[in-house]
Amino acid sequence: DPAGIGPELIARLLSQPETTRQANVVLVGDPWLWAEGQRVAGTRVETVPLQSLDAARTRTDSSHAALIAIDTVRAADVHRGKAEAAGGASVLKVLDTCMDAAKRGAIDAICFAPLNKYAMKQGGLEHEDELHHFAEYLGVTGYFCEFNTLGSLWTSRVSSHVPLKDAAGYLSKD
């Protein structure tokens, strides 16, 4: 979400060199937003330009993340901390671009920063959340769900429709 914390989270993550030692990381998005994320995070991350996701597998050196520059939203249309249609449409364009590449077999995985579902709905999302959008877009007809894993840590959703600031209130020991 261009108005949220995602760009700075990605900048902070990629400022740790071990991140790109574990995967061939390719960023897809607006160059101005990547620069802004780094500015907010107080870091500078070197990236190499890449023309398309179809070229991702041809990278022989993945020690630095690659950046595929696409124009999805004007900086003037993004207001930090505000859910707006322009930001939601931007997110959908980037996700759809990545899913198209996954369908072609050009990439193995998609990883994204926090999304604002309200902004996405304003921007054209026709589902309750991105998971259902993914399922329809990718033609999944069977059961699907989301689990996030990191080593032995597994997490799942509390709710798809609750702002992150309110999520703790939905948890209990039961």
PLM feature spans:
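Glycine-rich phosphate/diphosphate-binding loop of Rossmann-like nucleotide-binding domains
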Residues: R157-D174
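Short, acidic Gly/Pro/Ser/Thr-rich loop/turn segments
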Residues: R74-D77, W154, V162-K165
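Contiguous, glycine/small-aliphatic-enriched amphipathic segments in soluble metabolic enzymes
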Residues: D1-L131, Y170-K173
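Short, well-ordered alpha-helical segments in soluble proteins
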Residues: A102, G124, L138-T141, V162
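Mobile beta-alpha loop/short-helix "lid" or hinge segments that flank ligand
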Residues: N148-S156, S160
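FAD-binding core/adjacent interface of flavoenzyme oxidoreductases
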Residues: A135-L150
